[in-house]
Structure formats: structure tokens, C-alpha cells
Amino acid sequence: MSFPYFISPEQAMRERSELARKGIARAKSVVALAYAGGVLFVAENPSRSLQKISELYDRVGFAAAGKFNEFDNLRRGGIQFADTRGYAYDRRDVTGRQLANVYAQTLGTIFTEQAKPYEVELCVAEVAHYGETKPPELYRITYDGSIADEPHFVVMGGTTEPIANALKESYAENASLTDALRIAVAALRAGSADTSGGDQPTLGVASLEVAVLDANRPRRAFRRITGSALQALLVDQESPQSDGESSG
């Protein structure tokens, strides 16, 4: 007589967690950090069409690591939720904390009820409305729906420990955009060097996706930094002059 295969709930949760963590660890790293002008997002991403960083609403941005199709579904769902709420009530009623809570509930439900968890980690960031003085808000949402409020920076995907350690040593509050980008890129290089046997990789315009939530913009804070504008900022890291211009 054969007995049905039984797995305890605790073991099932452990296996789901391990699956999700391994999937996220295979992804390229993403860093989000607060700087003097708002929030800077920097991702290792050689693709120009599959974006890991996005605008969610006027003052709210999004970054993710993991499986693209899974976090892109979440991104589009977040945009739809924000648009609907902003239209039904008021644009100021859409907040980063609110969207982070929605994502946490969604991921928690998927983790406990579906056969396979999402292999994703998310960051939702918000800057103050134009004319207000309030520090940026950064929220990390993990595959199981856990949510954490991070005061300075968020690291996701890849080998996070060396990147987080580098940021702990080099992060400076109220840094300029040029300095913040230098800190973020150096931290990403530290993570890549850890996985490549100590060789410091070259992270340039072609391999980086960069965007900011600019608190000094009147309505829509999100802007991408690409092409010559990004190149100028990367060059300024060696001979700092100005924060340059952005495009996109």
C-alpha cells in the first residue's frame, strides 16, 4: 500500500522562500538611494527595452530585481491602481506608502496561495510634493510580502552583501547627484567584483539604467538620465564640475 506524499507547511514555505531567493540572486543588482535632490535609481541593465526602473505616479518611483515578466506585471498593476485612485479622489491621495502596502499584500497573497512565489524584490520611493520639505521615503518589498522602510538606500538582486557594505561605508546624506551616482556605481562594482573573482567590471552608459525622482520638479518628479547626460555625470565622477543635464 502506497501512502500519499506529504510535505509539512513549514517545509513548503522554506522551499518557496529558497526558490524565490535563488531567482532574485541570479538577477543583476539595483540600487536606490536618497540624495540632496530626491532619490537616485541605478540598475545594472544592458537592455534598453526591458526596464527595471519606472515611474508609478507624480512623485512615486519603482525599481525591481528578479523575473522581468513578474515584476512588470506588478509595475503595470501599480500604475493602474495609482491612476484610478488619483482620478477618483485627488492626486495627492496617491502615496508611496500606499502603493508599497498594496504590493506587500499582493506578494504575500501570491506567496501563500499560489503554487510558485514571484521571484522578485521591489523598491517603491517617494519624494515630497513641490515646495514641501520632507525627506524621501524608500520602501523595500520582498517576495513574501514583507515590507521595510529604509532611511537611506535599498539594494536588490545579485550579491547584495558587498554592495550594502560598500554603501554603508561610502553613503553620505544630502550628496549631490554626481556624488550619489559615484557612490552607487562604486557599490555596484564591488558587488560585481565579488562574483567575478575580484576583477572590477566597467559599468558605463551601455550597461546602466539610471533615473531620479527630482523633488525640485513641479509635478512629475521622475526623469531618466541617458546617453550624453549620463556620460557627462560619469565623467564628472573623475573631475567633478556640475550635475549635468538629464534627458528622457
Swiss-Prot record:
Keywords: Acetylation, Cytoplasm, Proteasome, Virulence. InterPro entries: Ntn_hydrolases_N, Proteasome_alpha, Proteasome_alpha-type, Proteasome_asu_bac, Proteasome_sua/b. GO terms for biological process: modification-dependent protein catabolic process; proteasomal protein catabolic process. CDD domains: proteasome_protease_HslV (cd01906). The keyword Acetylation applies. The modification N-acetylserine is found at residue 2. Pathway: Protein degradation; proteasomal Pup-dependent pathway. One of its GO terms (molecular function) is threonine-type endopeptidase activity. The formation of the proteasomal ATPase ARC-20S proteasome complex, likely via the docking of the C-termini of ARC into the intersubunit pockets in the alpha-rings, may trigger opening of the gate for substrate entry. Interconversion between the open-gate and close-gate conformations leads to a dynamic regulation of the 20S proteasome proteolysis activity. It is found in: Cytoplasm. GO terms for cellular component: cytoplasm; proteasome core complex, alpha-subunit complex. SUPFAM superfamilies: N-terminal nucleophile aminohydrolases (Ntn hydrolases). It holds the Pfam family Proteasome. The 20S proteasome core is composed of 14 alpha and 14 beta subunits that assemble into four stacked heptameric rings, resulting in a barrel-shaped structure. The two inner rings, each composed of seven catalytic beta subunits, are sandwiched by two outer rings, each composed of seven alpha subunits. The catalytic chamber with the active sites is on the inside of the barrel. Has a gated structure, the ends of the cylinder being occluded by the N-termini of the alpha-subunits. Is capped by the proteasome-associated ATPase, ARC. HAMAP family: Proteasome_A_B. Component of the proteasome core, a large protease complex with broad specificity involved in protein degradation. Belongs to the peptidase T1A family. This is Proteasome subunit alpha. It comes from Mycobacterium tuberculosis (strain CDC 1551 / Oshkosh). The lineage of its organism: Bacteria, Bacillati, Actinomycetota, Actinomycetes, Mycobacteriales.
